[in-house]
C-alpha cells in the first residue's frame, strides 16, 4: 500500500511565505478594490466579511460548505462543482448574503474541498474545477484555478435575485454575465477589477488553496496529498 504523504512543518512554513508573496502582489490589491466597490450597507456583506467567514469555517470544520439552493443561505449537501449556487451565508454565520445593490451573491466551490478529508492533491496542484479570469482596463490581467469563488453581480444585477428571491431581468446582460448566472455551469468565471471594463460588471472574490490549507492545518486537520491511484 502506498503511504500518504503529508506536509512537513518546513514545507508548510515555505508555503506560508509563498502565500504572503502571492497575496501581496495580486490577491490583496484585488481584494481591496473589490471591497471598496461592494461597500458596506445595513445588513449587507463586504468582501472581507465573506473572506473571513470562509477561512474560519475551513479552520473550524476542516472543509468548506456546499452551496445553498436558494436565497435562504443554508448549505445543501451535494451542491458543488461548476454550477453556480447561492452563497451559504447562514451556514457561514453571516447576517446576510447580499451586496450593496441588494443582490444575492453567487457561490462556486470545488467538490473536493466540501468533505473531510479534503482532496488536497488536486487542489494544491492547481487543478480545481473553479477557473477565474480577472479583467481590467487593458483586458485580462490574471487567471487562477481556485477551490472557491464568490460572485457579486454588480449594479445591473443580471444573473441573480434580490433578498426576497425575485429574479432580475437578464436582457441587458453580456455573454459573460449570462454564462455565470446562478444556476449556470460556466467553465470560466469573469471578474472585473476596474470600472473601465464595460462588457460586464460582475466581481469575483477567490480564496487560494494554499491559504485554505493553512487554515485547515491551524484547525488541526491534516493537509495530506492523496496518492494517485496505481495501475494494476
Predicted regions and their residues:
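Short, glycine/small-hydrophobic-rich surface segments
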Residues: 42-45, 54-94, 114-120, 228-232
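A sequence-level detector of short linear motifs
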Residues: 66, 103-106
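Short, surface-exposed interaction loops/tails
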Residues: 37-40, 103, 113-232
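N-terminal single-pass transmembrane signal-anchor helix
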Residues: 1-30
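Low-complexity Ser/Thr/Gly/Asn-rich repetitive segments
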Residues: 32-34, 58-59
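Membrane-proximal amphipathic alpha-helices
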Residues: 35-47
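Short, surface-exposed polybasic-aromatic patches that bind anionic ligands, especially phosphate groups
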Residues: 109
Amino acid at each position: 500500500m502506498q503511504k500518504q504523504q503529508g506536509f512537513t512543518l518546513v514545507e508548510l512554513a515555505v508555503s506560508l511565505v509563498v502565500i504572503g508573496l502571492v497575496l501581496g502582489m495580486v490577491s490583496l490589491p484585488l481584494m481591496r478594490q473589490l471591497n471598496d466597490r461592494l461597500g458596506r450597507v445595513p445588513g449587507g456583506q463586504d468582501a472581507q466579511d465573506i473572506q473571513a467567514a470562509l477561512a474560519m469555517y475551513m479552520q473550524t470544520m476542516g472543509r468548506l460548505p456546499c452551496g445553498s439552493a436558494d436565497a435562504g443561505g443554508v448549505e445543501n449537501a451535494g451542491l458543488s462543482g461548476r454550477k453556480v449556487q447561492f452563497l451559504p451565508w447562514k451556514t457561514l454565520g453571516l447576517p446576510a448574503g447580499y451586496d450593496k445593490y441588494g443582490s444575492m451573491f453567487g457561490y462556486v466551490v470545488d467538490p473536493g474541498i466540501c468533505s473531510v478529508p479534503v482532496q488536497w492533491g488536486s487542489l494544491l496542484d492547481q487543478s480545481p474545477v473553479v477557473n477565474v479570469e480577472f479583467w481590467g482596463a487593458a483586458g485580462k490581467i490574471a487567471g487562477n484555478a481556485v477551490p472557491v469563488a464568490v460572485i457579486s453581480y454588480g449594479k445591473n444585477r443580471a444573473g441573480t435575485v434580490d433578498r426576497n428571491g425575485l429574479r432580475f431581468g437578464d436582457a441587458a446582460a453580456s455573454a459573460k454575465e449570462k454564462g455565470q448566472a446562478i444556476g449556470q455551469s460556466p467553465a470560466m468565471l469573469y471578474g472585473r477589477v476596474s470600472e473601465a471594463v464595460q462588457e460586464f460588471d460582475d466581481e469575483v472574490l477567490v480564496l487560494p488553496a494554499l491559504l485554505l490549507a493553512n487554515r485547515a492545518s491551524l484547525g488541526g486537520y491534516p493537509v495530506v496529498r492523496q496518492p494517485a491511484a496505481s495501475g494494476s
